[in-house]
Amino acid sequence: MKVRVLSSLLLLLVFPACQLAAQATSSTQRFSPPTRTFRFTYTFTVKDIPPEAKRVRVWIPVPQTDQHQTVGVLAVKAPVKTRMTQEPQYGNRMLYAEIEYPEIQNSALGKAEFTLEYKITRREYSRGNYVQLKRTDQKPSVVSASMSRLIAPDSLIPTDGKIKELAVEVTGSQSGAVAKAKAAYDYLFTNMRYDKTGSGWGRGDAVWACDAKRGNCTDFHSPFIGMLRADGIPARFDIGFPLPENKDKGDIAGYHCWAEFYAHKTGWIPVDISEAWKAKQKEDYFFGNVDANRVQLSTGRDVTLSPKQDGPALNYFVYPYVEVDGKPYDKLDKQFSFEEVKS
């Protein structure tokens, strides 16, 4: 099948960057450069496509320009025509492709290769430290209809039962949204450990994480989101890829995620508990700030794609999602890499 490079996507994703709503002040210690500019390459192959397959559908998460990153598309290489879509719940953008019979039979050795290349500038996302944020703290206010989804449960992030009980225990003595979030942050920082041994970790199952008290970034941030939502505080899940702090190029092994919560006077405030746990000297920094050593691809859990997938909602959306004849298909080879460039 012929490879097409969709240069028109340059116009779809490069938007004027907004100004940051708040900058780090001199009293917020910075550990990394405030910006990083790099080429990001997202490559994968759908392999072993059955020759009798009639339809292969592919959804690819696409980073987008916002206050914290500026994204330019350098190239999209795909075996068929793709189109940009956006799901309405969280606003996540994606590329969508369909391979249909007889194109499937004509594909090389039953596989389909996709490569997306970007130039990205990522900026530090800073709201200040806890002392600064506490000055304008208020009790959680009535949530607008547009934010109601962000106080509702997800499949693996309940807001009742054990998570509600934990919220009462951990945050109940605090009144403000910032103070409650800090109590939840401190509890998870102290009581969990970053540990990817064995099974169960990586799904972001808030109840499992509270019982096991270990896991990766999804497991740290799911109970945080659940406790805050149980208190009526909007909270959301962000996911993308990490950039090694002391390297200027190389492969990226897997995803990274963090969280945000909403305070009435300040707006959205980021936290990264798992990174704080791995670098204890950054415990204070990662409440209210996240560094530029990352790129965000999507927001949210229980994600319904556009066009809608036949399978269930996705737990999170950072890797390509593929269906063959209406069923999820996971025979994929994936590779992600970056290279620093001068801005």
Set out the residue ranges of the language-model regions.
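Positively charged n-region of N-terminal signal peptides that target proteins for export
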Residues: 1-5
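Bacterial N-terminal signal peptides
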Residues: 7-19
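Intrinsically disordered, low-complexity N-terminal segments that are enriched in acidic
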Residues: 23-126
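Sec-exported extracytoplasmic/periplasmic mature domains
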Residues: 50-51, 63-67, 121, 168-175, ...
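Acidic low-complexity segments
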Residues: 87, 113-194, 200-211
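Active-site nucleophilic cysteine motif
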Residues: 177-184, 213-228
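Hydrophobic/aromatic-rich core segments of domains that either
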Residues: 222-310
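Low-complexity, Gly/Ser/Thr/Pro-rich intrinsically disordered linker/tail segments
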Residues: 290-343
